[in-house]
Every structure is written in C-alpha cells, then in structure tokens.
Curated annotation (Swiss-Prot):
GO cellular component, one term: phenylalanine-tRNA ligase complex
SMART domains, per the entry: B3_4, B5, FDX-ACB
Main location: cytoplasm
Similarity annotation: Belongs to the phenylalanyl-tRNA synthetase beta subunit family. Type 1 subfamily.
Recorded name of the encoding gene: pheT
Catalysis performed (reactions): tRNA(Phe) + L-phenylalanine + ATP = L-phenylalanyl-tRNA(Phe) + AMP + diphosphate + H(+)
Stored InterPro entries: aa-tRNA-synth_II/BPL/LPL, B3/B4_tRNA-bd, DNA-bd_dom_put_sf, Fdx_antiC-bd, Fdx_antiC-bd_sf, NA-bd_OB-fold, Phe-tRNA-ligase_IIc_bsu, Phe-tRNA-ligase_IIc_bsu_bact
Coiled-coil region: none
Keyword line: Aminoacyl-tRNA synthetase, ATP-binding, Cytoplasm, Ligase, Magnesium, Metal-binding, Nucleotide-binding, Protein biosynthesis, RNA-binding, tRNA-binding
Protein name: Phenylalanine--tRNA ligase beta subunit
Length: 795
C-alpha cells in the first residue's frame, strides 16, 4: 500500500522527521518498502495566470502568451501546449528557475518571439508522467505563490507491506491509528457531517445471502454532473497513493477506499430494473465486467443483482451494464460488509485481484459502513452536485462478526515478554488500541475494537502490548531457564550412524509417503489387514503402509522408467499395523528398510558387469548389524515371506525373536510391479536393534595364531550358519575365528548333501598353543558337529 506522508499527518502529526516516521511504522509491524519524494527537485516555479493567448505568427503549433505571475509586468512566454488558453491558472517557471535534471530557464526567442519563462506540465516538474498539456490549476489559485507550497510537493510517498492479519491498515485511518498510539497522540479524524435526505427516492434492497453479506447499505443520489472535474487536491492525493484519476464518481469511491479502507461502488440507478438483490450466483450465470470481459459465475459467487440479472460480483468487480458513464445522472451508492470467506478465492478464479477484493478477503471493519457512506455522499455532492435520498440499511445482526472478551493474564504477559510492564501502562496501551478494558486481579478483560480481526486470543494481546511498548524498550537479559540435560547412554545406537554407514556404501536415503495404494500393498502383504483412510487424498493413497517396501519398490520402478537401472536406496519411517492391544488400535513401529538392484558396481572399463545378488545385500545388512555389537547373536533362517523368493530369502532373528526379512523380490511380484530385473530388499524393526552391546576392551594376543581347515558333509537342509555357530560355541576359549570359505556339491558327495569347508583360527592370549591342544580342539568341534548335525569329515 502507498500513501502520502502529508495525508497521514493530517490525521496524526508526530514531531519526528520522515526517516524516523518510516522507522516507527516498520517497528510497528508495517514494513516500509520505500520512501520517495512526490515531485522532482526544482525551484523558481510559481502560480501564474494566462492573461492573453494568441497564435504564434511563425508557427502553427505554438502560442504567444502574456502571463501574470504577480510581478511589475506581464511575462511574454511562448507555449506549445494544446490546452493553453486565456484565463487559465498555470505553473510558470520564471527566468532563473531550475527544473528536474538541472534544466535552467533562460530568456530566449522561439521562432522570432521572446519567451521569458516556461509553462510547465506535470512531467516537466517530475510529478507524474503526464505530458499531454500544461498543469491546469484551480481558478482561485493565488498568483505568485510558489507551486511547491501550493501543491504541497514537499511530501513523500510511503510504501508499506501490509501483512494479511492487518487489514485495518489498508487505509490511512489504520496507519494513523497505529502512529497515534505509538506517539501517544490523539487521532484527528476529518469531520464527517451526515448528509440529510432532501429527496425520498430509494430502491428496494433484499439480501438473500445474509451469511455472505451481513450488512448492505444503499443510497440514491440524483441529478449529479458526472462530467464535473475532480478537484486537484483529490487527484493529487490519489496520485500519491498510486491511483489514476478516472472521473469524479470513481475518484470519490477510491478516495474513501484509501482514506477509510472501505470499498464502495456506484451503480447507474437508471439501469437497475426493479431493485437490488444480494444473492449467490445461479449456476452458469454470466456477467460482463467493467473491463469488457465476460465472467462465467459459479454458484458460490456472491452477486449484486437487480430483479432480472446480475449487476456486479459482490466485493470484487462491477458489471459493465450498470456502470457509471458520461450520460449518468442518477447513481446508487453501495457500501457493504461482505464476509471474508464469501470473497476469498473468487477473484483469483476469474484472474482478478482488485483493491476491493484485497480488502474484503482480509476483513473490513463491520462498523464502518455508515461513516463511509456519509463521507462519500458529502464528497460526491460537493463535487458533482445532486440530491441525496435516505440511506437504506439491511443488516443481519446474527451474522455480523462478534468480538469476544479476551483474558490477558499477568503471568502470561511477563513470561512471553520476559519483562515486567506496569499495570497502568498495560491498561493504557490496550485502551489506546481501541479495546474495551476491565481490570482484574493480575489480569485484564479486553474486547478488541471492530476493526481488529487479528486480536482473538491472549497471545495477540501480548503481542500488541509488546509492540506498542516498543521492542527496543525491552532490555536485553540473559535467558533464564531450568535445563534438564538429556542423557545419552553409551549403549544407544543412533539411527543417524546407521544412515551414514549406508551412505558410505553407496545408498541414498529417500522419504516416501505413509499413504500407499491398497492394491499394491495387498500384492506385497496378501491377506494382511491395513488401516484405510476415511478421506484419502486419492484412491492410490488411501491405505496406511504395513511396511516400507511399498514406497521403496515404487521408487525403484520410477527410477527404472527414467533409465536409472542401478538403484541403492534406504528409508527409515513408521509402519502402521492394526493391533487391538495398541493405543487407538494401531501399532506404530519404526522400521529401517532398503532396496538394491542393477549392477554391483558403477560402470567402469576395468570391471565386469555383475548383477547384485542375495549375498551383496546380506553383507551390507551384516555391516549394519555389526554396529549393534550383536552380529554374533543374529541368525538368518529360511522362512517364507509372500513378497520374497522362497529360495533366496531369509528371516532375521535376534535372540530367538524375528526382527526382519532380507531377500530377492518374488518373481511374480516383480512382474506385477513392472520391476526390471532382480531386486533385493531388507527391512528391520529398528527399536529392537537400537540398544547396542558396548564393546569391551580385551588384550591382544602376542602369540601366533594357528589355522586349521576342515571339510564336513551335512544334509542340504542344514544351514551353514548353524555349523559356524556350533564351532564357535565348542571352541569358545581358543577358537577366535570361524569362516566358511567353500561349499561343494558334486562328485564324492551324496545327493541331498553338501560339503562345507571351514577355517578355524585358534589362539591363546597367554601362551603358544601346542599341536596336541590344537588337534584336540578341532576334534572336539568335529565331534560336536557329528552329534548335532550328523556331520562327517570329507576325505
């Protein structure tokens, strides 16, 4: 919003300069974007009168004039402006004057005729871009007066950013209120004398949409001269606010809009059939707007209509049919309060953003309409003449906004501000803001003024008190708080540490929606009940996920469709499992899951193209589990999962409790999801791993280690992990390493059996092991394997 500094000072005039005023407005929460002078830098320009005006003898487009500037004689000035005429009061740059751009006025001859000055246009004085003719001043402009003084050009245009909550400051009155409060000065409002009705002419008004339009005022003004010129003082105020003068009627409504923040509209009364009806638009109804475009209206659009057709979009834009034109003699002035919700979004739907819709969307003072109507009527009659009828007021009190009583507690005020403000100051601030205040014990009861829609809760009052008291007046004090430092156990494993490990292994973290497609989820978890949303964003996002695989596999498909075939991603997040024993019937588990597919390595000339397999993912997963210190307690067991390949998957158990799955996606599921090639997934219940085993320091043996290899034949269904676990258990004191380095099936091994080659690393921390001890330990392992798994040594 732009406004004139001098216009603001007519309402409240603090004893501070322009820079201090701009800073004060900014600190009040109305950020000043710029302060610009309203005219260029010039001097030596005065008010003059064209006494004589004749055609130049040597030029068709020039005139020779004699101009009275209040001196001893008339000045001879040659002028080329088409509007130059005898009797006109003008702005005269006399000899010695300096105009914007350091243009100096000197005596000269133009086509043989002497010229002792220049008759100036607005553009030549740096006031506006209007260069169509010289400035036409009122007939009563005092001759010889400095034009800067007469037009009050020692003024600034202040532009502010008004936040949506401060709609009351979209008018001079709102900004003036804040400045008056901050400087503890009275607000000097212009005297608005009610215009009594001198005629009985009215139009019937019916409000059929009281929720959208709680108050509607209409007034007939007859016999106006719409061609009457707008006074220069009004044009200048409008210009300094960024509004171009149109005609007297439009200028008056714009003036009231800028002054009071109340949008108004004028209809050509003679084009209204029957009366005014405020209603919602009919489906498919159209309206030709003032700019000539046709708007197709929706049923939720408020319209001002007569008994046959729509005349205007309520609170947004007028219609062409009922607009004021050069032939208009009788008008109906409209002044209304429209509910913000009935206007919000309607203008944008039609590609519009008007000054009226901007204000109505944010909220207009519901108590302002009578004042604005009287102000507009007085200005219109003073400028255009005419006679006014009575004001017709249709108000639905039940739908008008009501201001609730807000309690402000002393404890809350002190706690949020961090500084004690005296009771009498708090009361004074609230009352200066326009609140009705009742003081209590350590509290205040306040009713916000009608123009402050943003004052609704206790925190709003705290903000207002702090703002008016002055943020700069609140002393800087160290924050005093009782801090309870959070404990961090050494046994806590940070999920961030695990993510870093996966990042180092080439994985990228993703975040997918918790809302998933129930059809896809049923493919991954057939027969498992999921939580369905009553009001989903879409059908494809109508179920809560049972695992992270649904979103991760969809991400893989998305990337493969964009030629990204090597994918390594992971995600941590909640799954939502229906559980009657859980709060609200839903168990929320924090999960860690990942997916890999494509080549094992990035493409490189020295590396063969090898596709990832089960052991690639299992190795990465073991690295994660190793961070917990529980890898030795983890078992990978063959266990069916409908989403995984039955021969290339495993359930993950920790101390006998299942904590997740790892494996290749089932070929049938791959086909249904349009996955390209082998895809492997894992998922872990993170909360069962977050408590890690703290590593214990131990002595490093200075004595040599001994390796012994054995090959044992066992049944095909015996897991190799069980064999390794048994070897560790038997040789717990001397066996420091057990590793499976070969699996053989074929000649020499019976069908249904396999040969496992295992290395045993034996070492003692206190001495060198004797060969007999080593042999005894190896024999003990073989015997244990024979007893438990019916294993035999392979020849």
């Amino acid at each position: 919003m732009k406004f004139s500094e001098l216009w603001l000072r007519e309402w409240v005039n603090p004893a501070i300069d322009s820079d201090a005023l701009a800073n004060q407005i900014t600190m009040a929460g109305l950020e000043v974007d710029g302060v610009e002078p309203v005219a260029g830098s010039f001097h030596g320009v005065v008010v003059g009168e064209v006494v004589e005006c004749a055609q130049h003898p040597n030029a068709d487009k020039l005139r020779v004039t004699k101009v009275n500037v209040g001196g001893d004689r008339l000045l001879d000035i040659v002028c080329g402006a088409p509007n130059c005429r005898q009797g006109l009061r003008v702005a005269v740059a006399t000899i010695g004057a300096v105009l914007p751009g350091d243009f100096k006025i000197k005596a000269a001859k133009l086509r043989g005729e002497p010229s002792e000055g220049m008759l100036c246009s607005f553009s030549e004085l740096g006031i506006s871009d209007d260069h169509n003719g010289i400035i036409e001043l009122p007939a009563d402009a005092p001759i010889g007066t400095d034009i800067r003084e007469y037009l009050k050009l020692d003024d600034n245009t202040i532009e502010i950013s008004v936040t949506p909550n401060r709609a009351d400051c979209l008018g001079i009155i709102g900004v003036a209120r804040d400045v008056a409060v901050l400087n503890q000065l009275p607000l000097v409002e212009p005297e608005i004398v009610p215009v009594g009705a001198t005629i009985d002419d009215t139009l019937p008004i019916a409000v059929e949409a009281p929720d959208a339009c709680p108050r509607y005022l209409g007034r007939v003004v007859k016999g106006i001269n719409v061609k009457a010129p707008t006074p220069l003082w009004m044009k200048e105020k409008l210009r300094r606010c960024g509004i171009r003068s149109i005609d007297a009627v439009v200028d008056v409504t714009n003036y009231v809009l800028l002054e009071l923040g109340q949008p108004m509209h004028a209809f050509d009364k003679d084009r209204i059939e029957g009366g005014i009806v405020v209603r919602m638009a009919k489906e498919g109804e159209t309206l030709v707007l003032l700019d000539g475009t046709e708007a197709k209206l929706n049923a939720d659009t408020l319209v001002i209509a007569d008994h046959n057709k729509a005349l205007a979009m309520g609170g947004i834009f007028g219609g062409e049919h009922s607009g004021v034109n050069d032939e208009t003699q009788n008008v109906l002035l409209e002044c209304a309060f429209f509910s913000p919700l009935s206007i919000t979004g309607r203008a944008r739907r039609h590609g519009l953003h008007t000054d009226a819709s901007h204000r109505y969307e944010r909220g207009v003072d519901p108590a302002l309409q009578h004042k604005a109507m009287e102000r507009a009527t007085r200005l219109l009659i003073d400028i255009c003449g005419g006679e006014a009828g009575p004001v017709i007021d249709i108000t639905n009190e039940a739908t008008l906004p009501k201001r609730a009583t807000i309690t402000l507690r002393r404890s809350k005020l002190d706690r949020l501000i961090g500084h004690h403000i005296a009771d009498e100051q708090v009361t004074d601030i609230l009352r200066r803001l326009g609140c009705e205040v009742t003081e209590g014990k350590d509290e205040w009861q306040a009713v916000a003024p009608s123009w402050r829609f943003d004052m609704e809760i206790e925190e709003d009052l705290v903000e207002e008190v702090a703002r008016v008291y002055g943020y700069n007046n609140i002393p800087d004090e160290p924050v005093q708080a009782s801090l309870i430092m959070g404990t961090h156990r050494e046994a806590d494993l940070s999920l961030k540490r695990v993510k870093t490990l996966l990042n180092d292994k080439g994985y990228q973290e993703v975040i997918t929606y918790s809302f998933v497609d129930p059809k896809v989820q049923q493919m991954i978890h057939p027969g498992v009940e999921a939580l369905l949303l009553p009001s989903p964003i879409s059908v494809e996002m109508s179920a809560m996920r049972l695992s992270l695989w649904t979103g991760l596999l969809a991400t893989v498909v998305y990337n493969q469709n964009r030629q990204q075939n090597r994918v390594r991603i992971f995600e941590s997040g909640l799954r939502f499992v229906p559980d009657t024993q859980a709060p609200l019937g839903i168990r929320q588990d924090l999960m860690l899951a990942g997916v890999i597919c494509g080549n094992r390595y990035e493409e490189h000339w020295n590396l063969a193209k090898e596709t990832v397999d089960f052991y690639d993912l299992k190795g990465d997963l073991e690295s994660v589990l190793d961070l917990t210190g529980k890898l030795n307690e983890v078992e990978f067991r063959a266990e069916a999962n409908p989403a995984l390949h039955p021969g290339q998957s495993a359930a993950i158990y920790l101390k006998g409790e299942r904590i997740g799955f790892v494996g290749v996606v089932h070929p049938e599921l791959e086909r249904k999801l349009d996955l390209n090639g082998r895809t492997l997934v894992f998922e872990l219940e993170w909360n069962k791993l977050a408590d890690r085993v703290v590593p214990q320091a131990r002595e490093i043996s200075r004595f040599p280690a001994n390796r012994r290899d054995i090959a044992v034949v066992v049944a095909e269904n015996v897991p190799a992990a069980d064999i390794l676990s048994e070897c560790k258990k038997v040789g717990v004191n001397q066996v420091v390493g057990v590793n499976l380095f070969d699996v053989y099936r074929g000649k020499g091994v019976a069908e249904g059996y396999k040969s496992l080659a295992i290395s045993l690393i034996l070492q003692d921390t206190s001495r060198t092991l004797e060969e007999e001890e080593i042999a005894a330990t190896v024999a003990k392992c073989v015997e244990a394997l024979k007893e438990r798994f019916q294993a035999s040594l392979r020849d």
